[in-house]
């Protein structure tokens, strides 16, 4: 049987930081590239990284403030220009850098008249302030001013219901998002069968992480999410002593082909290569381009997965199932293609 040779990139994926700058203490910028990627891969990687950078990257922020006997957050404190609510909003904007886990405490204890900035916060050793000039309040009179703060490392945006409190403790809507913005773009290169894509990724952070550090963390988080799928044991799969063999309930399209075999005879699906099915060369090459090499790979795909393969046609799907009916003792659903 003659097989058509399909050209493809054999180069190793490489990434590089092509631009890095500090626009201000609270605005870092980085631009990265990843290449070479096959058609469609750049979009897949770009979407996943953008979501992980914005939603999964951890940050440290102030989550609570305790002023003493203050009746409510709209109160004013004698000798202070700002209301309690304005001070809470200023504390919310403080950018912290740390590697702590759990909750830590901090405090502010000063005497007026003077401006209070982030530099006046007394922090635990594991925490530092990115921009010490960030304003907090203005003391207009020679009064003592003290705030107890709670600091926590987390991810995302968290709000808490404000309850009437007698001890002057107020929650702060915590924004644990060190990545301010992420953009990605795709550039197509090459021609013919040698086409490939380059992914450009732009990251802006608040200074608590550099863009490169944020990219590392987001990548690790994505890897951790997919690791369970690499484990040998899978729910619903009955493995025998030979891990390459399992019974037929999962030899199907995920939802539609739930009972492919009439009998309970076991088939070593990952030992049957698509080369052995004597498929037409066009269909064979479509499957190979999609990294489908064995019967197990093939039967793990849904109809929608196959139709998304580049150049895959309805006739190719029909040919595949006609071949499976011919070679395997399966009860395949009719008119699937």
Swiss-Prot record:
Cited HAMAP family: RNApol_bact_RpoA
InterPro entries: DNA-dir_RNA_pol_insert, DNA-dir_RNA_pol_RpoA/D/Rpb3, DNA-dir_RpoA, RBP11-like, RNAP_asu_C, RNApol_insert_sf
Keywords: Chloroplast, DNA-directed RNA polymerase, Nucleotidyltransferase, Plastid, Transcription, Transferase
Assembly description: In plastids the minimal PEP RNA polymerase catalytic core is composed of four subunits: alpha, beta, beta', and beta''. When a (nuclear-encoded) sigma factor is associated with the core the holoenzyme is formed, which can initiate transcription.
SUPFAM superfamilies xref list: C-terminal domain of RNA polymerase alpha subunit, Insert subdomain of RNA polymerase alpha subunit, RBP11-like subunits of RNA polymerase
Source species, domain of life: Eukaryota
Compartment list: Plastid, Chloroplast
Enzyme Commission number(s) of this protein: 2.7.7.6
Organism ancestry: Eukaryota, Viridiplantae, Streptophyta, Embryophyta, Tracheophyta
Record region (Alpha C-terminal domain (alpha-CTD)): 264-337
Protein known as: DNA-directed RNA polymerase subunit alpha
Similarity annotation: Belongs to the RNA polymerase alpha chain family.
The keyword Chloroplast is assigned to this record: yes
Reactions listed under catalytic activity: RNA(n) + a ribonucleoside 5'-triphosphate = RNA(n+1) + diphosphate
Source organism of the structure: Oryza sativa subsp. japonica (Rice)
């Amino acid at each position: 049987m003659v097989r058509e040779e399909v050209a493809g990139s054999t180069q190793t994926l490489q990434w590089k930081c092509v631009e890095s700058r500090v626009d201000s203490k609270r605005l870092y910028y980085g631009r990265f590239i990843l290449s070479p990627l096959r058609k469609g891969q750049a979009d897949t990687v770009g979407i996943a990284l953008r979501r992980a950078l914005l939603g999964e990257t951890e940050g440290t922020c102030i989550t609570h403030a305790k002023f003493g006997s203050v009746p409510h957050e709209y109160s004013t404190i004698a000798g202070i220009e700002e209301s309690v609510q304005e001070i809470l909003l200023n504390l919310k904007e403080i950018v912290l850098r740390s590697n702590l886990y759990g909750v830590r405490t901090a405090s502010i204890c000063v005497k007026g008249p003077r401006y209070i900035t982030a530099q006046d916060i007394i922090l635990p050793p594991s925490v530092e302030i990115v921009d010490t000039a960030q304003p907090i309040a203005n003391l207009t009179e020679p009064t003592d001013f003290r705030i107890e703060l709670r600091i926590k490392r987390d991810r995302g945006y968290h709000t808490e219901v404000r309850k009437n409190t007698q001890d002057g403790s107020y929650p702060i809507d915590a924004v644990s998002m060190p990545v301010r913005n992420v953009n990605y773009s795709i550039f197509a290169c090459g021609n013919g069968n040698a086409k490939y894509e380059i992914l450009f990724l732009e990251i802006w952070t608040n200074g608590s992480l550099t863009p490169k550090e944020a990219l590392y963390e987001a990548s690790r988080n994505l890897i951790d999410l997919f690791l369970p799928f690499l484990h040998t044991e899978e729910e619903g799969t009955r493995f025998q002593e030979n891990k390459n063999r399992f019974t037929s309930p999962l030899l199907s399209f995920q939802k539609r082909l739930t009972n492919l075999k009439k009998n309970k005879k076991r088939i070593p699906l990952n030992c049957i290569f698509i080369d052995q099915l004597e498929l037409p060369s066009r269909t064979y090459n479509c499957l190979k381009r999609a990294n489908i090499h064995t019967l197990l790979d093939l039967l793990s795909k849904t109809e929608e997965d196959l139709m998304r393969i580049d150049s895959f046609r309805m006739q190719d799907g029909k040919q595949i199932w006609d071949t499976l009916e011919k070679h395997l003792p399966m009860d395949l659903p009719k008119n699937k293609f």
